Curated annotation (Swiss-Prot):
Function as written in the Swiss-Prot or TrEMBL entry: Component of the ribosome, a large ribonucleoprotein complex responsible for the synthesis of proteins in the cell. The small ribosomal subunit (SSU) binds messenger RNAs (mRNAs) and translates the encoded message by selecting cognate aminoacyl-transfer RNA (tRNA) molecules. The large subunit (LSU) contains the ribosomal catalytic site termed the peptidyl transferase center (PTC), which catalyzes the formation of peptide bonds, thereby polymerizing the amino acids delivered by tRNAs into a polypeptide chain.
Chief place of localization: cytoplasm
GO cellular component assignments: cytosolic large ribosomal subunit
Annotated organism of origin: Candida albicans (strain SC5314 / ATCC MYA-2876)
Subunit structure: Component of the large ribosomal subunit. Mature ribosomes consist of a small (40S) and a large (60S) subunit. The 40S subunit contains about 32 different proteins and 1 molecule of RNA (18S). The 60S subunit contains 45 different proteins and 3 molecules of RNA (25S, 5.8S and 5S).
Official protein name in the record: Large ribosomal subunit protein eL32
Length: 131
């Protein structure tokens, strides 16, 4: 099994979700983030004590942006043929088996990935041990 490409330390700067202003106060206001646009809005004017707003400073390092904790980019695999794409990229990409794949096909995908030297992020998911 190939190890991942060397990279800087992965830092997720803000792991909480940005909540919409007054979503905690009114049930009709969903938590999904919306930018405040009112002329008198204290959130838009960035007053002290208001909720944090998403901005470019919260962004991740470009080199580590889409990496999982093991240091791989994830590629969604739905059948055995999809693994052939990863043959030349075993150090930078890891296969993740889609949730819609049956347990019988999962076994085949994991076996082929092992043969090709491709890392699978969820090899034990949905496996039927009785079959």
């Amino acid at each position: 099994m190939a190890t991942s490409v060397p990279h800087p330390k992965i830092v997720k700067k803000y792991t909480k979700k940005f909540k919409r202003h007054h979503s905690d106060r009114y049930h009709r206001v969903a938590e999904n983030w919306r930018k405040q646009k009112g002329i008198d809005s204290c959130v838009r004017r960035r007053f002290r004590g208001t909720i944090p707003q998403p901005n470019i400073g919260y962004g991740s390092n470009k080199k580590t942006k889409f990496l999982n904790p093991a240091g791989y980019k994830v590629y969604l695999v739905k059948n055995v043929k999809d693994l052939d794409v990863l043959l030349l990229h075993t150090k930078s990409y890891a296969a993740e088996i889609a949730s819609s794949v049956s347990s019988r096909k999962r076994v085949e995908i994991v076996a082929k990935a092992k043969k090709l030297g491709v890392k699978v992020t969820n090899p034990k998911g949905k496996l039927n041990l009785e079959a």
